[in-house]
Structures are given as structure tokens and as C-alpha cells.
């Protein structure tokens, strides 16, 4: 019994180390989302901080469309970060059984 508890504790500590490493890796990434066939792009960090917005000058005459494209590009980048985070966090918890419905911090 004690061996099982010790093994579980080691497994949990290893998972915690892996999760911390994955979070550090995620924080370092930059992802670019785009909309309007690439006419608008938004670059976000892994923490979803906006680093850059690029807008094709031809779009400045239609502010409403530009607003929609910026939002779509932001959402595209955000979804890419979510997918990357899920992948990295899944690798960090490989082999560790999480209870049904339990979600990671991301």
C-alpha cells in the first residue's frame, strides 16, 4: 500500500514538473491568426497578449468590415494557441489518468 502511495506521489510530482515546463513553453510561443484571405493578421503570445496587427491598406475604407476581420483574425490566433496548449499539456500528463471531467488549467 505504501509503495502505491509513494509511486502515486512520484507520478504527481513528475506531472507537475511536466506541466510547469509545458506552461513555460506555451508562454514563449507566438501564433499568427489571419482573416480575409490574409488581408488582416493578428499575432498573439501563448499568454494571448497581442504582439502585432497587420492590416492591408485597401481595407481602411470599410471600417465595419475591418472590425470584423480583426476580430476573426484574433479568434483564429486564439484558437491556434488553445490547440497548441492542449497538445503540450496533453503530452505533459501522458500516462497519468485524470478523473472524468477534470480539466487542466488551460
UniProtKB/Swiss-Prot annotation:
Keywords of this entry: Cytoplasm, DNA-binding
Region described as Disordered: spans on this chain: 81-106
Gene Ontology CC annotations of this record: bacterial nucleoid; cytosol
Subcellular location: Cytoplasm, Nucleoid
Coiled coil (residue ranges): none
Function: Binds to DNA and alters its conformation. May be involved in regulation of gene expression, nucleoid organization and DNA protection.
Record-stated family: Belongs to the YbaB/EbfC family.
Protein name, as recorded: Nucleoid-associated protein Smlt1015
Amino acid at each position: 500500500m505504501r509503495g502505491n502511495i509513494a509511486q502515486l506521489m512520484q507520478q504527481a510530482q513528475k506531472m507537475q514538473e511536466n506541466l510547469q515546463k509545458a506552461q513555460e513553453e506555451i508562454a514563449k510561443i507566438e501564433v499568427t491568426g489571419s482573416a480575409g484571405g490574409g488581408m488582416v493578421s493578428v499575432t498573439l503570445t501563448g499568454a494571448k497578449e497581442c504582439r502585432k496587427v497587420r492590416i492591408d491598406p485597401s481595407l481602411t475604407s470599410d471600417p465595419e468590415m475591418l472590425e470584423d476581420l480583426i476580430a476573426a483574425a484574433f479568434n483564429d490566433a486564439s484558437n491556434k494557441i488553445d490547440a497548441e496548449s492542449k497538445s503540450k499539456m496533453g503530452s505533459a500528463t501522458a500516462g497519468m489518468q485524470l478523473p472524468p471531467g477534470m480539466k487542466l488549467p488551460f
